[in-house]
């Protein structure tokens, strides 16, 4: 069976991506990164999703981006309730580049020629590393920078959610049997994975379920 490394954050998008990769016949190797994120309960969610969706292996890699800083997700900076103009403070510098690089390294080790990630350019928060140009550029890099690429084995970077709305992602997940109740999206999620209901990630997630006409399985803290 062909193999793929899938980036798994523990959120709804990456859970849907695993299901889509499996539907395409890939044996999935899921990679999560403990990068110093304050909402560490997403890693607990990643473990739940990996187990529920039957991945071949789930690896958690430690890369502490707090030493670099520059993001409300790693630093002692308030997470805003809603997105504004420009690149938001929840952007983690070079995060997707770093994570895809780790996925690329593992792919070479396990003999996978395909990488999957859940970046989205429709209902997203304005992150530069979620754009189609970034995904295309990383695929070029992957084929230039690896033994497999130099030997003529084409490496592919898939972003199957890139042009889907959050509602579309919900519908695809439901079609494929994804249990979104296992996932955590909130930037302020507590230790039990309960969502704040106010941050940009919560807003986008809630709108996705509402627009799709699907009951929202998110576990919320008491909303004020």
From Swiss-Prot:
<dbReference type="InterPro" id="IPR018317">
    <property type="entry name" value="QueC"/>
</dbReference>
<keyword id="KW-0436">Ligase</keyword>
<dbReference type="GO" id="GO:0008616">
    <property type="term" value="P:queuosine biosynthetic process"/>
</dbReference>
<feature type="binding site">
    <location>
        <position position="202"/>
    </location>
    <ligand>
        <name>Zn(2+)</name>
    </ligand>
</feature>
<protein>
    <recommendedName>
        <fullName>7-cyano-7-deazaguanine synthase</fullName>
        <ecNumber>6.3.4.20</ecNumber>
    </recommendedName>
</protein>
<keyword id="KW-0067">ATP-binding</keyword>
<dbReference type="GO" id="GO:0005524">
    <property type="term" value="F:ATP binding"/>
</dbReference>
<dbReference type="GO" id="GO:0016879">
    <property type="term" value="F:ligase activity, forming carbon-nitrogen bonds"/>
</dbReference>
<keyword id="KW-0862">Zinc</keyword>
<feature type="binding site">
    <location>
        <position position="199"/>
    </location>
    <ligand>
        <name>Zn(2+)</name>
    </ligand>
</feature>
<feature type="binding site">
    <location>
        <begin position="8"/>
        <end position="18"/>
    </location>
    <ligand>
        <name>ATP</name>
    </ligand>
</feature>
<comment type="pathway">
    <text>Purine metabolism; 7-cyano-7-deazaguanine biosynthesis.</text>
</comment>
<keyword id="KW-0671">Queuosine biosynthesis</keyword>
<dbReference type="Pfam" id="PF06508">
    <property type="entry name" value="QueC"/>
</dbReference>
<keyword id="KW-0479">Metal-binding</keyword>
<feature type="binding site">
    <location>
        <position position="186"/>
    </location>
    <ligand>
        <name>Zn(2+)</name>
    </ligand>
</feature>
<comment type="function">
    <text>Catalyzes the ATP-dependent conversion of 7-carboxy-7-deazaguanine (CDG) to 7-cyano-7-deazaguanine (preQ(0)).</text>
</comment>
<dbReference type="InterPro" id="IPR014729">
    <property type="entry name" value="Rossmann-like_a/b/a_fold"/>
</dbReference>
<feature type="binding site">
    <location>
        <position position="196"/>
    </location>
    <ligand>
        <name>Zn(2+)</name>
    </ligand>
</feature>
<comment type="similarity">
    <text>Belongs to the QueC family.</text>
</comment>
<keyword id="KW-0547">Nucleotide-binding</keyword>
<dbReference type="GO" id="GO:0008270">
    <property type="term" value="F:zinc ion binding"/>
</dbReference>
């Amino acid at each position: 069976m062909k193999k793929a490394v899938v980036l798994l954050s523990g959120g709804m998008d990456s859970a849907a991506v695993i299901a889509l990769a499996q539907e395409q016949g890939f044996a999935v190797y899921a990679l999560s990164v403990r990068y110093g994120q304050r909402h560490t309960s997403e890693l607990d969610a990643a473990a739940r999703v990996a187990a529920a969706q039957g991945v071949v292996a789930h690896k958690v890699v430690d890369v502490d981006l707090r030493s670099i800083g520059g993001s409300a997700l790693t630093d002692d900076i308030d997470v805003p309730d809603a997105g504004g103009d420009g690149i938001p403070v929840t952007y983690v510098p070079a995060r997707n580049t770093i994570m895809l690089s780790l996925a690329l390294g593992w792919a070479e080790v396990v003999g996978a020629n395909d990488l999957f990630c859940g970046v989205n350019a429709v209902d997203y928060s304005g992150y530069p590393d979620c754009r189609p140009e970034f995904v295309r550029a990383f695929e070029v890099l992957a084929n230039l920078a690896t033994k497999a690429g130099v030997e003529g084995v084409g490496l592919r970077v898939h972003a199957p959610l890139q042009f889907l709305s959050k509602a579309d992602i919900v519908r695809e997940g439901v079609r494929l049997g994804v249990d979104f109740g296992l996932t955590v999206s909130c930037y302020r999620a507590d230790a039990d994975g309960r969502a704040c209901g106010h941050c940009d990630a919560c807003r986008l997630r809630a709108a996705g379920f509402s627009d799709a006409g699907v009951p929202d399985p998110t576990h919320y803290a008491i909303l004020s």
